[in-house]
């Protein structure tokens, strides 16, 4: 019976990585199934040892503990507090995953399941140019128009950028020439889907981030500098060839210039929030205003004719500012600790692929958090917390051996 439960748990975890890029509802159901199966299968001692050895797990638990602490001094309504507890619940769930994804076989299966899911999204994105797919979110055929299949283009671009990194790493590590060609093709098609088939400006930036991580983490010596120069030239060519990318950057520049007068645009709204949120933080710099408090407290600083509408009170489009407003320097530091622990785990692994992917994930999370609430927004938080759990498990499983000191006579 126990072996069957463990098999079901492994299947549920694999299913989670296969389906979360496409269905939040199914991912949430699998989360519940995983928790129940995790409780049934027991083996708590071994799981505790895995959690104990994983600094990413401790960082995630610390961050959620700070969210719980914020309940006791928050002026927010119970609806807002409950919303935050639910949103950040994926942090302790990630720790459950870190204790359960114990074998190399299961870890590889989970990563490959995610790659398969994103492969389906990638194929669908390209087919969307010519055919109106019934499962696609967008229904506008053609080239140089935005296409996203599930959810929103922001989250699709985040995950697609990570797929580019996976494909590039596997290109240089695959021993088979045909496999190298196939993975290189995946990286190219995924990159073009971001630059020419999406209107997400953050996606363009995140693509540059993963390319930089790949060049400076996976390559060495002359190959590294050759790739860096070639990459810069290619990005200039891409910018020149993508009308969609040029239009989006020109729009961003225009919105930035008019930010003082037009605060309802995407860029103007962010700039306005980046100005008023620090004023809120300054009132309670150490512990913040409490869990869920941003939604109501920020309204005291809003002075625009439209009032404190949902676009302002939802979140400040910056995870660092969000934690600082609700949880002060303590929450801000805990989030930095999470990012640093991911990078530290990457440095401890003996597997070059895992090292590059974990550094890339940490970089994606950090950069995306400058313009989005990465751990609060539903689809983004699914990706970052699950992948953080998986890659930290793989880094722990393949960690470098501790050098032994030879005794001298």
Can you say where each PLM-predicted feature lies in the sequence?
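Transmembrane signal-anchor hairpin modules in multi-pass inner-membrane enzymes, especially those
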Residues: 1-79, 101, 105-116, 170-181, ...
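Hydrophobic transmembrane alpha-helices and their immediate junctions
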Residues: 215, 326-366
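Short, aromatic-rich membrane-interface segments at the entry and exit
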Residues: 23-35, 80-83, 179-181, 202-206, ...
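A membrane-periplasm/extracellular boundary helix in multi-pass inner-membrane enzymes
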Residues: 218-261, 275-283, 291
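Hydrophobic core segments of transmembrane alpha-helices in multi-pass, intramembrane catalytic enzymes
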Residues: 27-38, 83-95, 154-170, 202-214, ...
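Alpha-helical transmembrane segments of multi-pass inner-membrane proteins
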Residues: 12, 108-140, 151-219, 229-241, ...
């Amino acid at each position: 019976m126990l072996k069957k439960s463990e098999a079901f748990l492994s299947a549920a975890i694999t299913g989670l990585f296969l389906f979360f890029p496409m269905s939040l509802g199914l991912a949430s159901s699998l989360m519940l199934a995983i928790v129940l199966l995790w409780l049934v299968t027991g083996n708590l001692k071994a799981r505790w040892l895995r959690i104990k050895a994983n600094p990413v797990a401790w960082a995630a638990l610390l961050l959620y503990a700070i969210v719980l602490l914020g309940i006791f001094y928050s002026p927010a309504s119970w609806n807002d507090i409950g919303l935050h507890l639910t949103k950040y619940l994926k942090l302790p769930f990630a720790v459950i995953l870190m204790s359960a994804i114990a074998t190399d076989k299961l870890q590889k299966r989970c990563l490959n399941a995610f790659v398969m899911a994103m492969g389906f999204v990638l194929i669908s994105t390209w087919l969307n140019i010519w055919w109106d797919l019934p499962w696609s979110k967008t229904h506008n055929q053609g080239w140089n128009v935005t296409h996203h299949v599930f959810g929103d283009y922001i989250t699709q671009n985040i995950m697609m950028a990570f797929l580019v990194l996976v494909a590039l790493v596997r290109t240089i590590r695959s021993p088979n020439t045909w496999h190298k060609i196939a993975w290189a093709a995946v990286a190219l098609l995924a990159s073009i889907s971001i630059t020419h088939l999406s209107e997400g400006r953050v996606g363009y930036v995140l693509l540059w981030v993963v390319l930089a991580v790949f060049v400076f983490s996976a390559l060495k010596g002359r190959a590294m500098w050759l790739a860096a120069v070639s990459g810069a030239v290619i990005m200039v060519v891409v910018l020149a060839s993508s009308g969609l990318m040029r239009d989006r950057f020109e729009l961003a520049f225009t919105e930035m210039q008019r930010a003082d007068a037009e605060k309802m645009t995407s860029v103007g709204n962010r700039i306005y929030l980046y100005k008023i949120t620090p004023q809120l933080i300054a009132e309670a710099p150490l512990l913040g205003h409490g869990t869920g408090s941003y939604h109501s407290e920020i309204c005291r600083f809003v002075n625009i004719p439209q009032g404190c509408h949902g676009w302002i009170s939802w979140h400040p489009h910056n995870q660092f500012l969000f934690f600082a407003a609700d949880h002060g320097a303590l929450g801000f530091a805990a989030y930095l600790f999470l990012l640093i622990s991911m990078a530290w785990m990457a440095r401890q692994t003996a597997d070059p692929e895992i090292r590059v992917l974990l550094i890339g994930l940490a970089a994606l999370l950090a950069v995306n958090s400058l313009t989005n609430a990465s751990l609060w927004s539903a689809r983004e938080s699914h990706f970052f917390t699950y992948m953080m759990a998986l890659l930290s498990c793989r880094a722990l499983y393949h960690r470098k051996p501790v050098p032994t000191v030879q005794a001298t006579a």
